[in-house]
Regions:
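N-terminal non-catalytic cap/leader segment that marks the start of a structured domain
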Residues: 1-88, 180, 188
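Residues embedded in well-ordered beta-strands
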Residues: 4, 119-123, 144, 188
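Short loop segments at secondary-structure junctions
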Residues: 10-11, 95-96, 125-129, 149-150, ...
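Catalytic-pocket segment enriched in acidic/His residues
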Residues: 37-41, 46-50, 63, 67, ...
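A generic local secondary-structure boundary/capping motif
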Residues: 47-49, 78-81, 105-114, 128-135, ...
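Hydrophobic alpha-helical segments and helix pairs
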Residues: 79-128
Length: 210
């Protein structure tokens, strides 16, 4: 029922009654009276997207060095190779594609290859424009794990990545103060118990500060 909670160990503190949509995310635990919040076991709640309605979703294509090498070796590309991410630029995903980890993925275009990648998602807490790298992290509210789903084909990248449910975000938002260096995070993805992806954000071409 779209409630707001703060995760503490294996419990979720329900702060819906106190949460102000305009409140800066990183200061929520400080401003709220957590002692009088109702508590529920984390295992009993259904986790939706921790970001309800983002203004936009901006992504960088083929942003890991190892991924570029893999694509060249397997000759997998959306109709063309990406030799240089600086020339490829960033792209947008539809916000309507966003779901939480408990909502599931509705696969489309079953006659095509569909790929998936684990991603580090950076959530901005305030507007930013022409910010220096030294100040970049001051604008970050927190981080999430993302699952980016892609249908392979020759259409525009944004179209193939913007299908409903193809942007999974969660399991929750970790505030920026808990991650001092986002460029040293290990990301893994398992499918049915099998390790399918193992990478580190130190391998990013476009790092968080960039």
């Amino acid at each position: 029922d779209n409630r707001v909670g703060i995760v503490r160990d294996d419990q979720v503190l329900d702060v819906t009654a106190q949460a102000d949509p305009g409140t800066c995310i990183p200061s929520l635990p400080v401003r709220l009276d957590l002692e009088r919040c109702a508590r529920r076991p984390l295992a009993s709640v259904r986790l939706l997207s921790p970001v309800r309605a983002p203004g936009k979703i901006v992504a960088a294509p083929v942003n890991y060095r190892a991924h570029i090498e893999e694509m060249h070796k397997s000759n997998v590309s959306p109709g063309h190779n990406i030799p240089d991410i600086d020339r490829a630029g960033l792209f947008l995903k539809a916000t309507s594609s966003l779901v939480g980890p408990a909502e599931g993925i509705a696969q489309r275009f079953l006659d095509r290859r569909t790929d998936y990648e684990v991603e580090l998602v950076v959530v901005f807490g305030k507007s930013a424009s022409e910010v220096s790298r030294d100040e970049a992290l001051d604008y970050v509210a927190g981080y999430c794990v993302g699952l980016d789903i892609t249908v392979r084909g020759t259409e525009d990248r944004s179209f193939r990545k913007s299908i409903d449910t193809y942007s999974v975000l969660g399991p929750w938002l970790t505030t920026a103060d808990e991650i001092p260096d986002p460029d040293r995070l290990q990301l893994t993805l398992h499918q049915n118990g099998e390790l399918r992806q193992n990478t580190n954000t130190s391998d990013l071409l476009f790092g968080v500060r960039r």
